């Protein structure tokens, strides 16, 4: 309600937190939540939890389909998935997202747990399945651009930042 916050957007990093809210919310709260999603004031990630690369793709796909069905009567759906600190995803995970209408996958690889694919971070690519369907992926690092832009206070410059900044 304050003009200086008009462009603020809350992002639910995982579907689990949305599911827990939904369990205790009134019908009015659910409708308000869905309206905020539709208006772009709340973002919902298709990612259920930030587990690891061994998530069961069938279970994930069924859970995601359930949520797309729940949001459909409100005139909205989940288009984007965001994952943090998970350094790999299966082709089945990709297919579950594609099959359930997810178009964009934003991933933040945690370099303390492993390294970026082909040692390249902060780049985009299309992840294509055998039938030619594609998912647009942003391959970022933990804190996304926060380290490179210096948004993390008192953070020592590391070799990855120097490399990214061309120093």
Model-derived regions, located:
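Catalytic-domain carbohydrate-binding cleft regions of carbohydrate-active enzymes
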Residues: 1-167
């Amino acid at each position: 309600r304050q003009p200086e916050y008009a462009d603020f957007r809350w992002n639910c990093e995982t579907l689990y937190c949305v599911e827990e809210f939904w369990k205790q919310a009134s019908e009015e709260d659910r409708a308000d939540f869905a309206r905020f999603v539709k208006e772009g004031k709340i973002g919902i990630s298709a990612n259920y939890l930030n587990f690891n690369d061994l998530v069961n793709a069938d279970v994930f796909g069924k859970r995601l389909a359930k949520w797309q069905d729940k949001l459909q009567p409100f005139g909205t759906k989940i288009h984007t998935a965001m994952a943090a600190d998970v350094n790999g995803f299966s082709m089945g995970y990709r297919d579950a997202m594609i099959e359930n209408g997810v178009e964009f996958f934003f991933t933040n690889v945690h370099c303390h747990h492993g390294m970026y694919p082909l040692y390249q971070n902060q780049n985009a690519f299309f992840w294509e399945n055998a039938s030619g369907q594609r998912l647009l992926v942003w391959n970022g690092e933990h804190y996304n651009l926060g380290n490179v832009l210096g948004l993390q206070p008192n953070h020592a410059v590391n070799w990855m930042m120097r490399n990214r900044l061309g120093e």
